[in-house]
Amino acid sequence: MYGQQNNYGAPPPQQWGQAPPQGYQPGYQNGPPAVNYGAHPSQQQQWGAPPGPPQHQPYGAPPVNQYGAPPQHQQGYGGHSPQPPFGAPSPAPAGYGAPPTAPQGQYGAPSPYPQQPPQQGFGGPQQGYGSQPQGQSPMMYLGVPIPAPPPAVPVSTLAGYDARFDAERIRKATKGFGTDERTIIDTLSPLDAFQMDVLSRTYEQTVGRSLKSTLEKELSSWLEYTLVLLSLGPLGGDVYLLHRACNGMGTHEDLLNEVLLGRTNQEIFLLKEAYRRTYNQDLVQIVQGELSMKTERMFNMALSGQRDESPYLNHQLVQQDVETLYRAGPGKIGTDEIAICGILISRSKEHLKAIAQAFPARHRVSLSQMIHSEFSGHMRDALFFIARGVEADGDGVVRDCELLHAAMAGMGTKDERMIYRLVRNHWNRPRFNAIKNQYQVLYRNSLRRAVEGETTGKYEKALVGIIEQN
C-alpha cells in the first residue's frame, strides 16, 4: 500500500551528474502514502475518478531510497562503446537464445509433464505484427519477436523501413542550439523492436555516437528517461531497468518483481546473457547482493530458468498444489514460505491459472488475498504480483491496468513506475490494446486521458505518443 508521499518522482532542477541541491531528497519523504493499490478510485481522492475494479489486497510500497528520481547518466545497454562480450556462449545448434536444458523440479516437486516447447511470456506472442526479417526463427521477448543478440549477425536493413531517414531526422533535431524534442518523439514512438534496433545501429554508424548517449545529452528529466528506455528496445530496456533496480542506494524491489517474475526460461536466459554483455557482471550475483534470506532464495528460483513450460494441465496436481498452498499458509501456524514460492515460481502459467480458479472455490479466499494475509514485505509484493497476474483474465491484463492506475492514483504521480509500465507494455501492441480497453472498463476513463491528467509538455506528448502509436 502506498503511504503519504511528497514530490514522488519529482526530478531535481539541477543537471544530472551533479550533486543534489541541499535539502533535496528524491523519492518518498516521511514514509509512503496510505493509498490502497487497486482500490475503488473514490477512496484514493482522485478528481472525478470513476468506480474502480473489484477490491483486492494492495501492492506494497517501495523502500525509502532514491527510487523515483530520474537516473544518473550511466554507461549501459545501447550506450557508446559498450563492454565487450564476457563469457558469451558459442552459438548452439538450436539457435542462440535457447535456455540450457536443466532438470525440472529443482525447487519443489518434479514436473509431472513431458518436456514441451517453451511457453510464450508476457501474454503470449502477438500475431502478424513486427518487421522481423523473413526466413528467421524469431526470438521472443515480452511476447514479441526481437533481434537475436550477439553472437548472431545483426540485422542491417528491414523491408519497408528507412533507418537512414530516421537517423538523419534525429541528427537534425539535435544539431545546433536547442533540440527539436517533438521530432525525436515522433520518430521513436511508432517503432517496433526490430526497427528500433536497426535505427540505433544505423545512427551510431552514421553519426559516430550511440543514440542513447545523444538522447542523454540533448534531453533531461523524465522525457530523457522515457525516450532512452524506449530507444533500448524490449530486452535492452529491461537490462537497463535491472541495473537501475540494483544500482545506488537501496533496491528498487518493484522493478525486480516486474522484470524477473513470471518470465519464460528463454527470457531469463536472454536477460542474464544481455546483462553480462552490457555490464560485465553476473545478474544472479548482482540480485543476490541486493536481497537476503528467503527472498533471495525466491529470486534464485526465478533466475534459475527452470520453470515448467508444458501446455498440458494435470488437474490432479492442480488440486494437490491447492491443498499444499493452503497447508503451507492458512492451514498451519506460521507460513512455509519456500513451499509456496516453489509452486508459484516453478509451475507453468496455465497451471497457475488453474490454481487461481480452484483455490477460492475450495477455500473461499482468493490466492492473492491468501498471500497478502500470510506474507509481508518484499516477498508479499513479489508473490502478490504473480498471483494477480493469473487471476481475473489470467493473462495479467487486469493486473497491469491496476499497476498503471496505482502509478497515477493519490497524491502525486509515481513517474518512473508510470513510464516503465507504459513502455514495457507497449511493445506487444495487441496486448497493450487489451490493457487500454480494460483500463476504460475498470476506471471509466481512457488510459490516454489519465496520463494527460498527470503530465505536461513534451513529457506528456512522449507518453501519449507511446499510448497511441498504433
From Swiss-Prot:
Biased composition (Low complexity): 15-34, 93-110, 128-138
Its job: Does not appear to play a major role in virulence. May play a role in titan cell formation.
Family from the record: Belongs to the annexin family.
Keyword Calcium included in the entry's annotation: yes
UniProt name for this protein: Annexin C1
Spans annotated as Disordered: 1-143
SMART domains, per the entry: ANX
Disruption phenotype: Increases titan cell formation (low penetrance). Low or no sensitivity to high temperature or tacrolimus (calcineurin inhibitor); sensitivity may be background dependent. No cell population growth phenotype in a variety of conditions including high pH, low calcium, in presence of the antifungals amphotericin B or fluconazole, heavy metals (nickel or zinc), osmotic stress (NaCl), cell wall integrity stressors (Calcofluor White, caffeine, or Congo Red), oxidative stress (H2O2), or nitro-oxidative stress (NaNO2 or H2O2), or following ultraviolet light radiation. Normal mating.
Organism from which the protein derives: Cryptococcus neoformans var. grubii serotype A (strain H99 / ATCC 208821 / CBS 10515 / FGSC 9487) (Filobasidiella neoformans var. grubii)
